[in-house]
Regions:
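Feature for soluble, non-membrane regions of globular proteins
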Residues: 2-181
Length: 181
């Protein structure tokens, strides 16, 4: 299988892009992201970035970056279970830069809510919260939240804060910690 994230990170692009395989069923993220939202977001929009890139349609850089970001986004989730708090290296990074998980969440929400229009918000490997306008490949992503309307409108309409708060419930911290190694 074409490992898109690794090839971008290592700077080696293949001739075709494929979506990452989900580690959960389309109905496996509970109320955080519905089956309907995933069918549309993962099944149509993310797929379209790969398909357009592979067909040479549209802006190749835009489609490539869109596919890359969605690969990171969809690969960081797991089914919701219990209290979902960070641990390991990511918790250390968060506490070094924000003092606590709760203060990190507040800072992340503030950065996300400040985005005018669409984009992405992420925790970077240097401990900063950063935003991406449009689509751009960034190699320092630890936690990534899609802030385009298609990400939250199906399940949350315009309630971006509820969307963000429910993202924390499905983050797979083992994957996030692996991004820091």
């Amino acid at each position: 299988m074409y490992n898109f994230i690794r090839q971008i990170t290592e700077g080696r692009l293949g001739k075709t892009l494929e979506r990452v395989k989900l580690a959960y069923p389309l109905d496996g993220l509970g109320k955080s992201l519905s089956k309907q939202a995933l069918e549309y977001h993962y099944g149509k929009l993310y797929k379209a970035y790969c398909d357009r890139y592979n067909a040479g349609e549209g802006d190749a850089d835009f489609n490539e970056a869109g596919a890359y970001l969605h690969s990171i986004y969809f690969s960081q989730f797991r089914a919701p279970k219990g209290s979902n708090k960070p641990d390991g290296s990511v918790l250390t990074l968060i506490e070094e830069h924000f003092k606590s998980w709760e203060k990190f969440q507040e800072a992340f929400e503030k950065a996300a809510m400040a985005i005018q229009g669409s984009g992405w918000v992420y925790l970077a490997k240097d401990g900063e919260i950063k935003t991406i306008k449009n689509h751009q490949i960034k190699k320092d992503i630890v936690i990534l939240v899609d802030w385009w309307e298609h990400s939250f409108c199906i399940d949350y309409q315009a309630d971006k804060k509820a969307y963000l708060n429910n993202q924390w419930k499905i983050i797979d911290w083992s994957i996030i910690n692996a991004r820091l190694t």
